[in-house]
Regions:
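Membrane-helix boundary/interfacial segments in multi-pass membrane proteins
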Residues: 95, 147-155, 311-312, 320-375, ...
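Membrane-embedded helix bundles of polyisoprenyl
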Residues: 106-119, 129-171, 176-216, 224-246
Length: 468
């Protein structure tokens, strides 16, 4: 079977319904404006400031940000999604951040939907159940889109399913030149809207291992290799100045910490945490998904068929990568990892445990594969056992979806929209917008000074407020 089979109704309907459900999350942001609620840790207190200052000095040709640390190097504030600086150049900060949230979630939804459609594509049995396959892909895609990733990181997490889909399509020999160019364009787009040090290094590393294994098995794909090079070059161009500084070439201004205190943790405790919970900013509520994966494998392991080979292989590889990632991250933070890193100079502070940022994409791809396998089994033989298995799996999936919705970035904004007295700290509250507007007005009325002519010192408020 080939991908020439285009999505038709009713799967088209499911796709559009899911897309609308994801885009609808932007409505509360439009209503609330500066009263919208965003996670402020590692977002409003840091990365948003990086975007604002870099956008402010986008064309001045200076290597210094005068507002930051009394004139620090531009490399001290590296943007996690460099192309998004244009949003902060053209739009108010709260609108730009809301756009990053909606756009990131939408790309995540579309990517996961297409990824699961690709997995189910070679199954003859599922080809007669396109509507149900579309519904399952829509469900898992929406779940991934609503995960509470920080939008300030661009496509570093939300963009992974689409990247994986494009890479898998590039491997197929019957792709047209136009299709290959589109897939390559997304690879570059992903690089421009993600960070090398957050998830990019892990993507490049695992992808390189994939290509090496494919070469050893004589299944090397030149199209995939070219795409890998494109992503690498994109990251090198984005981070060239920082790399030169790290290796002592060019400017001597220190923009990052030079001293680090590394503390080792228990390998097994960290491995268990990585596998069952995830890492910082990569918590994805996959507890029930792990259970679903276990009993799905038990249910279908003896009934594997050529008809579902791609789905089962995708599930197996996803689970294998999840375990590998959890192990690698635990080793990095363990006594062995800390001992090895101690002699690495500036690189010893590199957070390679961020490889865990790839895990949510793999967990939800695995969930989709489990649902497809159980659906295929149910279509093949409608017995009580298969009906119960599929029903229980759907109940656990809905339970996970409910948990995601309760923890999503949408929930507090819905509550704020309904009840303006809702107590969570808003964008306006965090940056003390009203207070600083009064300060600005007072200084202008009494001294004739405009904001570009003076600096605000933070006394009793978060430094980010003054920089904003």
């Amino acid at each position: 079977m080939t991908e020439r089979r285009k999505m038709k109704k009713p799967e088209n309907v499911w796709f559009l319904l899911g897309a609308l459900a994801v885009l609808a999350m932007g409505i509360p942001y439009l209503i609330l404006g500066k009263d919208a609620i965003f996670v402020y840790h590692d977002q409003l207190d840091g990365e948003v400031i990086a975007y604002l200052l870099q956008a402010r000095h986008l064309w001045d040709g200076s290597g210094i940000l005068p507002e930051f640390m009394n004139g620090a190097s531009r490399t001290a504030l590296t943007m996690p999604a460099p192309a998004c600086v244009w949003l902060y150049r053209l739009l108010p900060a709260e609108t730009a951040l809301a756009c990053m949230q909606v756009a990131g979630s939408f790309v995540g939804y579309v990517g996961m939907f297409l990824l699961l459609w690709w997995a189910a594509e070679d199954s003859e049995i599922l080809s007669g159940r396109k509507g149900t396959v579309g519904f399952l892909a829509m469900t898992v895609g929406c779940m991934y889109a609503y995960l509470p990733f920080l939008p300030v990181y661009g496509l570093s997490q939300y963009g992974l399913p689409m990247l994986l889909y494009c890479v898998l399509r590039l491997r197929e020999r019957d792709r047209s030149i136009r299709e290959r160019l589109l897939y390559d364009a997304y690879v570059v787009f992903f690089g421009l809207n993600s960070s090398l040090v957050l998830s990019g290094f892990a993507v490049l590393g695992i992808w390189a291992v994939w290509e090496i294994i494919a070469t050893l098995r004589r299944k090397y794909s030149a199209a995939q290799g070219i795409a890998w090079i494109l992503l690498l070059l994109t990251y090198l161009l984005e981070n060239g100045a920082l790399f030169l500084q790290i290796f002592g070439v060019g400017e001597s201004t220190v923009s990052h910490k030079a001293e680090y205190a590394l503390t080792a943790v228990s390998f097994w405790e960290q491995w268990k945490t990585n596998l069952l919970q995830g890492g910082q900013h990569s918590v994805d509520y996959h507890g029930w998904i792990l259970l679903i994966a276990v009993f799905t494998v038990i249910a279908v392991i003896r009934r594997r068929a050529v008809d579902s080979k791609r789905i089962f292989r995708s599930l197996a590889i996803s689970c294998g990568c999840i375990v590998f990632i959890a192990t690698a991250a635990a080793l990095w933070d363990s006594g062995i990892g800390v001992s090895l890193r101690s002699g690495w100079g500036a690189l010893k502070g590199f957070q390679a445990n961020r490889v865990l940022w790839l895990s949510p994409c793999l967990w939800y791809f695995a969930l989709g594969c489990c649902l497809l396998l159980l659906l295929r089994q149910l279509c093949e033989k409608r017995c009580v056992r298969n009906v119960i298995l599929f029903t229980v799996t759907m109940i656990l999936t809905v339970t996970t979806a409910e948990q995601i919705l309760l923890q999503s970035n949408l929930k507090p904004n819905l509550q704020k929209t309904v009840n303006r007295e809702y107590g969570a700290m808003s964008f306006r509250d965090y940056y003390a917008v009203d207070v600083l507007d009064q300060v600005q007005e007072y200084i202008y009325d009494n001294f004739g000074e405009r904001p570009e002519d003076y600096r605000v010192v933070s006394l009793g408020i978060d430094p980010a407020a003054a920089l904003y």
